[in-house]
């Protein structure tokens, strides 16, 4: 959204990720949802920085997904049955923060249509 003459309006839309139209294969733990600690550590070491999870992850998305139940033992090849929609306002997403995507997604709201499959608690060795 942009503010001009004290009026707020939405700017142009951009597709962030679209698995249905592209491969049809669901994303499994994409970095905008969950990034491993080892990835953050490697980035910080390589770039002499101290970035945290919010450098990669869209804040608020994990919390919102907790309100939806996963479809267990469902074949990934089955057609999508969009389970829900989550809208993450720009101030809760990347806002004006520095991110791995640069400035491309600053001040952008995100709308996620999704289907959750076979969720489980992440094991410590998977981080």
Residue locations for each model-derived region?
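Cross-family detector of peptidyl-prolyl cis-trans isomerase
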Residues: 1-127
